[in-house]
Regions:
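Intrinsically disordered, low-complexity regions enriched in acidic/Ser/Thr/Pro/Gln residues
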Residues: 1-161, 166-167
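Short beta-strand-to-turn element immediately C-terminal to the catalytic PLP-Schiff-base lysine
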Residues: 159, 250-252
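Short glycine/serine/threonine-biased micro-segments
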Residues: 55, 170, 198
Length: 254
């Protein structure tokens, strides 16, 4: 896969004088449009870093592609306003009318004619060791640089074979997860061997992203919903939630 990034990154936060005279580090927002085969696909509002990773991860977790092997090139313009992904095949459009679907996280929307997305498939099993969850929780508690500066962003860590492979930050939890997934894809590491740890909530859309990424387990310091537990159980995703007492992807009526 060829990668052309003329943008790189911009300042993720600015120091702002508050009304009471104190100064605070405030995160910045960056808007970009992700194009697939020259057609607009998503508008994202994100932290202005790791745009190739965000775009690649977004295509996988939203079901537009089944693997990174379908992507021939990722190109980011100098201003970071346009991210182009070129596939080795045309996209198959749905028969339904086009819609814009807003995300509950930041101001992200899907653009243009929807495509036939990849169906959800059962994820592989992985024996998640208790020490792995502890290591992820410790890393999350320590905080990443942008969070330490602003306390206003989400994080997503990737664990591979017991070691933290990468960690990504963004103003949106969906974006942070997509950046982490994209980073793993660009590194050539099998997602089937990875565990994701998100700082955000895990409703159905986050569980769906993890399933489409093909990871065996998703860990969060927050609690899931009944529906996200059911979806995780249906496709074999280990859902480990809660600071002290992680839940499995099973549930009991109450």
């Amino acid at each position: 896969m060829q990668r052309i990034d003329l943008f790189g990154a911009a300042a993720a936060f600015e120091t702002v004088r508050m009304p009471d005279g104190t100064e605070a580090a405030i995160p910045t927002e960056h808007a970009a449009v992700i194009y697939v085969n020259e057609q607009p696909a998503f508008r994202v509002v994100c932290t202005p870093q790791l745009l190739p990773q965000l775009a690649l991860g977004r295509l996988l977790t939203e079901g537009w592609i089944a693997s990174a092997e379908e992507v021939e090139q990722i190109a980011v313009c100098a201003e970071g306003l346009k991210v182009n992904l070129y596939l080795n095949h045309p996209l198959t459009a749905r028969r339904a009318a086009a819609q814009e679907v807003s995300s509950c996280c930041t101001d992200n929307v899907a653009l243009g004619s929807p495509v036939e997305v990849q169906p959800l498939r059962a994820v592989p099993h992985l024996d998640v060791q208790p020490g792995w969850v502890d290591a992820l929780a410790a890393a999350m508690s320590a905080g990443l640089p942008l969070y330490q500066a602003t306390h206003a962003v989400h994080s997503c860590f990737v664990l591979h074979e017991g070691r933290i492979l990468c960690a990504c930050e963004d103003i949106g939890r969906h974006n942070a997860l997509d950046k982490a997934v994209g980073s793993v894809l660009l590194a050539g590491v099998p997602l089937s061997e990875c565990v994701l740890y998100t700082s955000g909530r895990v409703p159905m859309d986050m569980v769906r992203k993890a399933i489409r990424a093909g990871v065996p387990a998703l860990v969060s310091k927050t609690m899931p919903t009944v529906q996200s537990l059911e979806l995780a159980a249906e496709y074999g995703l280990q859902l480990l939630c809660g600071r002290k007492h992680p839940l499995t992807s099973s549930k009991s009526a109450g």
